Amino acid sequence: MPIHEVKHPLIRHKLGLMRRADISTKNFRELAQEVGALLTYEATKDFNLQEKTIEGWAGPVSVEQIHGKKVTIVPILRAGLGMLDGVLSLIPVARVSVVGQIRNEDTLEAETYLEKLVGELDQRMALIIDPMLATGGSMISTIDLLKKAGSTEIRALVLVAAPEGVEKVLEKHPDVSIYTASVDERLNEKGYILPGLGDAGDKIFGTKQKDV
């Protein structure tokens, strides 16, 4: 199933806190990291394990370790940085690629202004992270870049998604799996998610939030 709406009680509770209009930058930032980590847990539960014998405190012991999986985390700037530490807390050896996307507020189309990708993308699973999947433009553009650079296995972690954006992404890239805390109701006329979280980038970085 390409869309996974993760309804774990901890995720639902934390997402509810994030929806508050009066939430502080500190609390929003911390919750974005926490929910990002919980989504990572769900998105990686099919990783293969291999048994290995190590030296334990009382002698040799058989353990299981993740085998054969290289990962690159791909935050979409700038808001995706707000989830990065949470994902890295669970996959600390992952390489980080960076894609900068900005939305043209007149056309609602995504424009790429930065692309810094790690090597060997054909040998890595790419985890795209972005708090909001709204119109889908930034996500589609980022997936296009990754595939052009050699990526063959791509998953996306988003805190909140709009059904319109999900539909567009999966129409263009049906092989990409999306993990989200919530598929919300719809987009408003300005392309923002309702009920959504407001402008996640502004809330993470403490900048002035636009009228959404």
Swiss-Prot record:
SUPFAM superfamilies: PRTase-like. 5-phospho-alpha-D-ribose 1-diphosphate binds at R78, R103, D130, P131, M132, L133, A134, T135, G136, G137, S138, D199. Catalyzes the conversion of uracil and 5-phospho-alpha-D-ribose 1-diphosphate (PRPP) to UMP and diphosphate. It catalyses: UMP + diphosphate = 5-phospho-alpha-D-ribose 1-diphosphate + uracil. Its EC number is 2.4.2.9. Pfam families: UPRTase (PF14681). GO terms for molecular function: GTP binding; magnesium ion binding; uracil phosphoribosyltransferase activity. Uracil binds at I193, G198, D199, A200. It comes from the Bacteria. It comes from Marinobacter nauticus (strain ATCC 700491 / DSM 11845 / VT8) (Marinobacter aquaeolei). Keywords: Allosteric enzyme, Glycosyltransferase, GTP-binding, Magnesium, Nucleotide-binding, Transferase. Its cofactor is Mg(2+). Binds 1 Mg(2+) ion per subunit. The magnesium is bound as Mg-PRPP. GO terms for biological process: UMP salvage; uracil salvage. This is Uracil phosphoribosyltransferase. Pathway: Pyrimidine metabolism; UMP biosynthesis via salvage pathway; UMP from uracil: step 1/1. Belongs to the UPRTase family.
